[in-house]
């Protein structure tokens, strides 16, 4: 297979399924051959990223992720998509282990703030691990935006939605989701809310009548993935036609 990309997912699996669904549905295709070529690594047994970030005595996910990168080096995709926000804590080490470009989901989400001409405060929602590591805060602040991190009470609600409702119970609790967004916009006085966890993106995919100003990181990554894959496919076709 030529002109393909690789998806490094499984963290978690339902969120990865959501990402794959997005790229398939958003790719404009009228026949099988017009869809995108990709390989999916659904590495569900990667140890919990947040658990390790919060407590270094927990099992380190890095060796598992590096093993995945070594396999990518053998396959030689055009680029790699990492569909776990918290795993971007290891991004620099992962990118250093390969010459294949890895798309940076938090950076793409931060760039979307610029595209949408954001001027106000930006709330960042995600796992405790990504909050502690500053994965999104760093990218957003680098572009000059004021960031707001959830306080303990709000973070507990986010944790409950991500881990208990979605990961453990496979339940998309729309009422709790909207309660969290309302707090971020109204109580924290934020113009935009970044969904910096793929479980939150999964929640957003199926939320009805969502009028909150969210920046859905996974949705944006899906769009950038499609754009890049199509551009590289077209470039390859142009090269062939010139010969």
Curated annotation (Swiss-Prot):
It comes from the Bacteria. It is an enzyme of class 5 (isomerase). Optimum pH is 8. InterPro entries: Asp/Glu/hydantoin_racemase, Asp/Glu_race, Asp/Glu_racemase_AS_1, Asp/Glu_racemase_AS_2, Asp_race. It catalyses: L-aspartate = D-aspartate. The active site is at 84 (proton donor/acceptor), 197 (proton donor/acceptor). Its EC number is 5.1.1.13. GO terms for molecular function: aspartate racemase activity. Keywords: Isomerase. It holds the Pfam family Asp_Glu_race. Optimum temperature is 37 degrees Celsius. Substrate binds at residues 48-50, 85-87, 167. Homodimer. Belongs to the aspartate/glutamate racemases family. This is Aspartate racemase. It comes from Enterococcus faecium (Streptococcus faecium).
């Amino acid at each position: 297979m030529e002109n393909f990309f690789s998806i490094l997912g499984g963290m978690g699996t339902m969120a990865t399924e959501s990402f794959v669904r997005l790229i398939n549905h958003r790719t404009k295709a009228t026949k099988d051959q017009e869809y995108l070529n990709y390989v999916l690594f659904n590495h569900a047994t990667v140890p919990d990223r947040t658990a390790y970030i919060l407590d270094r005595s927990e099992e380190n996910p890095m060796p598992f992720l590096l093993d995945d990168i070594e396999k990518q080096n053998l396959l030689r995709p055009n680029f790699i998509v990492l569909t776990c926000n918290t795993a971007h804590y290891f991004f620099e080490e992962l990118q250093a282990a390969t010459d294949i470009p890895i798309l940076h989901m938090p950076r793409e989400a931060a760039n979307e703030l610029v595209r949408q001409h954001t001027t106000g405060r930006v709330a960042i929602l995600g796992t405790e691990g990504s909050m502690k590591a500053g994965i999104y805060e760093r990218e957003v602040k680098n572009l000059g935006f004021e960031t707001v991190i959830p306080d303990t009470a709000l973070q507990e609600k986010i944790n409950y939605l991500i881990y208990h409702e979605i990961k453990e119970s496979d339940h998309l609790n729309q009422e709790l989701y909207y309660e969290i967004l309302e707090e971020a916009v109204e109580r924290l006085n934020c113009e935009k809310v970044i969904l910096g966890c793929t479980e939150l993106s999964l929640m957003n995919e199926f939320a009805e009548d969502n009028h909150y100003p969210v920046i859905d990181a996974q949705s944006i990554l899906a769009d950038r993935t499609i754009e890049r894959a199509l551009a590289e496919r077209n470039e390859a076709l142009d090269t062939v036609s010139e010969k």
